[in-house]
């Protein structure tokens, strides 16, 4: 008989990478015979705290996934009520997603209530221990959350190191971020380029995902200008919603003379269109100023796309340099040199073939095995 597993975190109708991950993990559990569903949010962020246009998807709900939209992130009475409900339900495992200290009081309180039943194993998949943008309450809130958890899984060694400083004696382990294989099949490049209204005479680099300072779009724009690729029928697609003021970026594009070389698609890219953008690109570029791990990397792997990443956080852990792409320091010239090397030496076919082989290690089974087993202490 399979286990009863509850995944705690965002899910449909909430949109974004966390929802995509949780829904795919839930599917993986059910596919192997467990009974899994998602405990999600009726209110995730108050609208005043959400930087994007909307938190909600306009697409159809994922098939064959049960979702309980019950958690109000800012209502302590709700946390106690939800915790008591799941304490009585007593699933075998509760898998909490943790990504920012704002959620710590809510999730930590629910976890504490559930633990009172003495039966349910409480595991956290920790995307971050500390956020990219710091706040005075980060340490206290995170400490409150981690003290409520039995075992931890991190998806980068840098997060594992942060976790060890907070709770050195709790079981924890590293498992690489699994590959997103739920965005459909690779589309022939010419067809994909046409489908998103671009000129098939050009080659395209892709910057994908919501835009905040730590994502390093400014660094990429400067490097792209330095590379001179705009004069060689190559353009940069920036596909993602601004989560901060777009004016400095637009001014930078103008200052660098890149108005005709940068294609901005600054709405949230729905799941049904992700394949079109990745299939149209020669390489996916992530010039982050800071990072832990990246879901974008695991979408790129699904589509066998070469990648350029900066040497921050856990990005370099999953992109072997000169095999599936480039690992660069946060330096405009180094990034420009790598971009030029990619095209000058026609690296796409080689890197793509290597990505197809390398991606086989990024399975959802590994996450499920880590959740189910007693974790080994890793340093």
What residue ranges belong to the model's regions?
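Glycosyltransferase donor-sugar binding loop
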Residues: 41-45, 208, 235-248, 267
